[in-house]
Amino acid sequence: MEENNWQQRTELLLGEEKMKRIRASHVLVVGLGGVGAYAAEMLCRAGVGRMTIVDADTVQPTNMNRQLPAMHSTLGMPKAEVLAARYKDINPDIELTVLPVYLKDENIPELLDSAKFDFIVDAIDTISPKCFLIYEAMKRHIKIVSSMGAGAKSDIAQIRFADLWDTYHCGLSKAVRKRLQKMGVKRKLPVVFSTEQADPKAVLLTDDERNKKSTCGT
C-alpha cells in the first residue's frame, strides 16, 4: 500500500477486493440537495470510479443552512456544476458525467439506458419522477436506495434504514407506496426514513414551488 495513496484508510477497512469493486462501479445519483450532494461526495471519497450526477436546480439563499454546494460565492450557479468541480478536486481520477437537467417521466428511461449503472441513489423530493425512477430501475434490475422525507423533523436518532413497506410516520413514504402500488410495484425497496412525526408548526403551505404543496423547516 503506497504512502501517498489517499484511499489507504478505506482500503484498510474494506480490503483490496472490495476497493476494486468500488473503483469499477458506476453510480447514478439523482437529486443534489440536502441528501444527494452528501451521498455523492461520500461515494466520491470512497473511490467510486464512475458517477453520474443529475439535478437541474441552481443554488438559492434558502439552501445556505444545509446544502453542500450553497455558499455566497455560488448563489445562482447550477448545483450539479458546483458539485462536479468539488468532486473532481477530491478525486481527480473519477469519471464524472454531469446532467443539469430536470428529470421527468418521459426522459427517465433514456437516462437509465444511457449507461450501465451498478447502483442508483434516489434523492428526489417530488413524487412523480421519484416513483418513475424507482419503477424504471426495478424494471431493469438496477439496485436502488431511496431517500424519504426529513422536512419538519430534527431528531437524528430516529433515522432508520428499512424496506419502504415497513416505514411509518413519513408522509413521503406513504405517498410513494401508494403510487408504486398503482404502478404494480410490490418488490422490496431499501429506503432511509425517519420515525419522527413531522412538527406541524414547521410546515408552511404554499403553491409557489414547482410540484410542491408545502415548504418544511429543514
Which positions does each model-derived feature cover?
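N-terminal charged helix/coil linker that caps or initiates catalytic domains
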Residues: 1-27
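Glycine-rich phosphate/adenylate-binding loop
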Residues: 2, 113-119, 124-129, 139, ...
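Conserved N-terminal Rossmann-fold NAD(P)-binding element of oxidoreductases
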Residues: 29-31, 54
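Hydrophobic/small residue at the entry helix of a nucleotide-binding pocket
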Residues: 35
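Glycine-rich phosphate-binding loop and adjoining beta1-alpha1-beta2 segment
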Residues: 48, 53-91
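Conserved SAM-binding strand-loop segment of SAM-dependent methyltransferases
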Residues: 73, 95-101
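Conserved SAM/SAH-binding loop
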Residues: 100-108
